[in-house]
Design a protein with these regions (language model features):
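Short helix-to-turn junction characteristic of helix-turn-helix DNA-binding domains
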Residues: 1-3
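Alpha-helix boundary/capping and short turn/kink residues
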Residues: 7, 19-22, 142, 157
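A cross-kingdom feature that marks ATP-driven nucleic-acid transaction machinery
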Residues: 31, 39-214
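Short amphipathic alpha-helical interaction segments
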Residues: 18-35
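Short acidic, hydrophobic short linear motifs in intrinsically disordered regions
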Residues: 5-16
């Protein structure tokens, strides 16, 4: 399950593992969820009966991505402390921490009492149109959708011109799937906040790392 960040459906897990779709698989997934190894969610844009299962245990993720295939390299971790390999892990780990602290994020946004669902969404691109992927989507019963971008940085995060364009594309792609009554709030979840600048005005809501541990 560590091979796909967004997770897998029951059918995909059954096909990959050879386990039949039945009580045994259901019990296994339920036990893993109860132990906080995985979480489940309904992917936005798919039938409500569809459930995705996503690995969220940080040790398992780190082991499978960066240790399992380098078991004989005793110095792999220390040799790569400043490499792009572990920098990529920082981003992955921060996103998983966000998934694990959904209730705290709701609290920081001031919507702890609003019924919500957490999801992810992606649409494939075509020759005419670029695709889009959103890894953290909060769909609220008050007709607001928080499109969340999770960014790990060692200082306040700076939004570039190119990134603002990417964010606007994601907003427009998502807007095309919503009802006219729904509005989108671009929400940045970062370690130390968003740096004020020419392109930061696109952000409507912010959540900082410190908010996740209150």
């Amino acid at each position: 399950m560590a091979t796909r960040h967004s997770g897998f459906t029951r059918e995909e897990i059954s096909q990959a593992t050879g386990l039949p779709l039945g009580g045994g698989l259901s019990n296994t997934l339920a036990a893993l969820a109860e132990s906080d190894f995985i979480t489940s969610y309904s992917p936005y844009g798919m039938p409500k009966s569809t459930t995705c299962y996503k690995l969220i245990d940080n040790f398992c993720l780190f082991w499978q991505k960066y240790v399992e295939h380098h078991g004989k390299e005793t110095g792999f971790i220390s040799d790569n402390m400043t490499s792009d390999v572990l920098k990529a892990w920082h981003g992955v780990a921060f996103e998983e921490v966000c998934w694990q602290h959904f209730q705290q994020i709701k609290q920081a946004l001031g919507v702890a009492g609003v019924k919500t669902s957490l999801s992810a969404w992606s649409v494939k691109g075509t020759e005419e149109k670029e695709g889009a992927q959103i890894d953290f989507l909060i769909i609220r019963n008050d007709n607001v959708v928080n499109l969340c971008e999770m960014k790990f940085a060692s200082a306040p995060y700076t939004i570039s011109k190119e990134e603002e364009q990417r964010l606007r594309h994601r907003i427009e792609s998502l807007k095309a799937t919503l009802s006219p009554k729904q509005s989108i709030h671009l929400t940045m979840i970062t370690t130390y906040g968003v740096a004020y600048g020419k392109h930061s005005g696109i952000v409507q809501k912010e959540v900082k790392m410190e908010d996740l541990f209150k």
